[in-house]
Amino acid sequence: MRTFTGRLTACLLATGIGGPTMAQTVSPGPSGAVTPVEIAAETINGDLRCRPPRARLPAEERLELRVVNSSERPVAFAAPKFFNASQIVESGGFTWDIAQDRFVVAPRSTVWVRLQSPVPGEYYYSCFEQGQIPTDSTSGFLIVVPAAR
Protein backbone atom coordinates (compact mmCIF):
# COMPACT_ATOMS: atom_id res chain seq x y z
CA MET A 1 0.00 0.00 0.00
CA ARG A 2 1.17 3.52 -0.76
CA THR A 3 0.38 6.54 1.34
CA PHE A 4 -2.66 8.50 0.28
CA THR A 5 -0.60 11.69 0.24
CA GLY A 6 1.90 10.08 -2.13
CA ARG A 7 -0.89 8.90 -4.38
CA LEU A 8 -2.42 12.36 -4.40
CA THR A 9 0.82 14.16 -5.00
CA ALA A 10 1.72 11.83 -7.85
CA CYS A 11 -1.69 12.07 -9.47
CA LEU A 12 -2.90 15.51 -8.35
CA LEU A 13 -6.22 13.80 -8.54
CA ALA A 14 -9.74 14.91 -8.60
CA THR A 15 -10.52 11.30 -8.79
CA GLY A 16 -15.01 8.65 -0.47
CA ILE A 17 -18.39 16.32 16.30
CA GLY A 18 -20.39 17.57 18.54
CA GLY A 19 -19.99 14.54 20.80
CA PRO A 20 -18.91 11.07 19.70
CA THR A 21 -21.96 10.35 17.56
CA MET A 22 -22.76 13.63 15.84
CA ALA A 23 -21.28 15.39 12.82
CA GLN A 24 -20.86 19.08 12.82
CA THR A 25 -19.87 21.64 10.26
CA VAL A 26 -18.47 24.91 11.48
CA SER A 27 -18.44 28.11 9.45
CA PRO A 28 -14.98 28.89 8.12
CA GLY A 29 -13.01 31.48 10.01
CA PRO A 30 -10.45 33.87 8.56
CA SER A 31 -9.13 33.55 5.03
CA GLY A 32 -7.44 30.22 4.42
CA ALA A 33 -9.55 28.43 7.02
CA VAL A 34 -11.33 25.20 6.18
CA THR A 35 -14.69 23.87 7.32
CA PRO A 36 -14.28 20.76 9.50
CA VAL A 37 -16.66 17.85 8.94
CA GLU A 38 -16.42 14.82 11.23
CA ILE A 39 -17.57 11.24 10.86
CA ALA A 40 -17.44 9.30 14.13
CA ALA A 41 -16.95 5.54 14.38
CA GLU A 42 -17.59 3.91 17.74
CA THR A 43 -18.54 0.58 19.24
CA ILE A 44 -21.87 0.40 21.10
CA ASN A 45 -22.73 -2.90 22.82
CA GLY A 46 -20.16 -4.65 20.64
CA ASP A 47 -21.52 -3.27 17.35
CA LEU A 48 -19.76 -0.72 15.18
CA ARG A 49 -21.71 2.49 14.54
CA CYS A 50 -20.82 5.43 12.33
CA ARG A 51 -22.46 8.80 12.67
CA PRO A 52 -24.06 10.82 11.35
CA PRO A 53 -26.24 9.00 8.87
CA ARG A 54 -26.46 12.24 6.85
CA ALA A 55 -23.78 14.94 7.05
CA ARG A 56 -24.42 18.24 5.26
CA LEU A 57 -21.48 20.14 3.84
CA PRO A 58 -21.07 23.07 1.46
CA ALA A 59 -20.30 22.52 -2.22
CA GLU A 60 -17.07 23.62 -3.84
CA GLU A 61 -15.46 24.86 -0.63
CA ARG A 62 -12.33 23.86 1.25
CA LEU A 63 -13.14 21.23 3.85
CA GLU A 64 -11.30 19.06 6.30
CA LEU A 65 -13.01 15.68 6.52
CA ARG A 66 -12.05 13.99 9.79
CA VAL A 67 -12.82 10.36 10.52
CA VAL A 68 -12.65 9.77 14.28
CA ASN A 69 -12.42 6.15 15.44
CA SER A 70 -13.13 5.92 19.18
CA SER A 71 -13.43 2.12 19.10
CA GLU A 72 -10.77 -0.39 20.12
CA ARG A 73 -10.68 -1.91 16.61
CA PRO A 74 -9.40 -0.65 13.26
CA VAL A 75 -12.15 0.72 11.03
CA ALA A 76 -12.09 1.05 7.23
CA PHE A 77 -13.66 4.16 5.68
CA ALA A 78 -14.80 4.39 2.07
CA ALA A 79 -16.52 7.18 0.12
CA PRO A 80 -15.22 6.53 -3.41
CA LYS A 81 -17.63 8.72 -5.39
CA PHE A 82 -17.14 11.61 -2.96
CA PHE A 83 -13.35 11.40 -3.15
CA ASN A 84 -13.40 10.92 -6.92
CA ALA A 85 -15.54 14.06 -7.32
CA SER A 86 -13.45 16.15 -4.90
CA GLN A 87 -10.10 17.80 -5.40
CA ILE A 88 -7.84 16.44 -2.66
CA VAL A 89 -5.37 18.97 -1.27
CA GLU A 90 -3.58 16.93 1.41
CA SER A 91 -4.18 14.18 3.95
CA GLY A 92 -2.65 12.58 7.01
CA GLY A 93 -2.80 9.76 9.50
CA PHE A 94 -3.54 6.83 7.19
CA THR A 95 -2.51 4.68 4.26
CA TRP A 96 -4.78 4.52 1.22
CA ASP A 97 -5.66 1.01 0.00
CA ILE A 98 -5.78 1.65 -3.74
CA ALA A 99 -7.08 -1.82 -4.62
CA GLN A 100 -10.01 -1.54 -2.19
CA ASP A 101 -10.56 2.24 -2.61
CA ARG A 102 -10.61 2.90 1.14
CA PHE A 103 -8.39 3.79 4.08
CA VAL A 104 -8.12 2.33 7.57
CA VAL A 105 -8.39 4.37 10.75
CA ALA A 106 -6.43 2.85 13.62
CA PRO A 107 -8.14 2.29 16.99
CA ARG A 108 -8.62 5.49 19.01
CA SER A 109 -7.28 7.60 16.14
CA THR A 110 -8.33 10.42 13.86
CA VAL A 111 -7.41 10.81 10.21
CA TRP A 112 -8.07 13.82 8.01
CA VAL A 113 -8.36 14.76 4.37
CA ARG A 114 -8.31 18.40 3.25
CA LEU A 115 -10.15 18.86 0.01
CA GLN A 116 -12.18 21.09 -2.25
CA SER A 117 -15.68 19.65 -1.91
CA PRO A 118 -17.50 18.44 -5.02
CA VAL A 119 -20.61 19.79 -6.71
CA PRO A 120 -23.94 19.34 -4.89
CA GLY A 121 -25.17 15.79 -4.58
CA GLU A 122 -25.51 12.83 -2.23
CA TYR A 123 -22.38 10.73 -1.79
CA TYR A 124 -22.53 7.37 0.01
CA TYR A 125 -19.94 6.59 2.69
CA SER A 126 -19.35 3.52 4.82
CA CYS A 127 -17.33 2.52 7.85
CA PHE A 128 -16.71 -1.14 8.53
CA GLU A 129 -14.36 -3.55 10.19
CA GLN A 130 -11.90 -5.39 7.95
CA GLY A 131 -13.61 -8.39 6.38
CA GLN A 132 -17.11 -7.15 7.27
CA ILE A 133 -19.86 -5.82 5.05
CA PRO A 134 -21.15 -2.26 5.68
CA THR A 135 -24.62 -2.05 7.25
CA ASP A 136 -27.18 0.72 7.72
CA SER A 137 -25.64 1.52 11.12
CA THR A 138 -22.15 1.86 9.60
CA SER A 139 -23.10 3.80 6.47
CA GLY A 140 -24.49 7.18 5.55
CA PHE A 141 -24.45 10.02 3.07
CA LEU A 142 -22.33 13.11 2.67
CA ILE A 143 -24.96 15.60 1.48
CA VAL A 144 -23.23 18.35 -0.48
CA VAL A 145 -25.41 21.45 -0.76
CA PRO A 146 -24.87 24.76 -2.56
CA ALA A 147 -22.66 26.98 -0.41
CA ALA A 148 -24.30 29.95 1.31
CA ARG A 149 -23.14 33.18 -0.25
Report each predicted region and the residues it spans:
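Bacterial N-terminal signal peptides that target proteins for export
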Residues: M1-T9
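Bacterial N-terminal signal peptides
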Residues: T9-G18
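Sec/Tat signal peptide C-region and signal peptidase I cleavage site
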Residues: G19-A23
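Extracellular/periplasmic metallocenter environments
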Residues: Q24-S31, Q100-R149
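N-terminal edge beta-strand
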Residues: G32-R62
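Beta-strand cores of secreted/periplasmic/IMS beta-sandwich domains, seen most often
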Residues: P53-A78, T110-V119
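Beta-strand acidic-aromatic groove motif in beta-rich domains, primarily in extracellular
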Residues: P74-K81, Y124-S126
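Short aromatic-acidic-glycine turn motif
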Residues: F83-G92
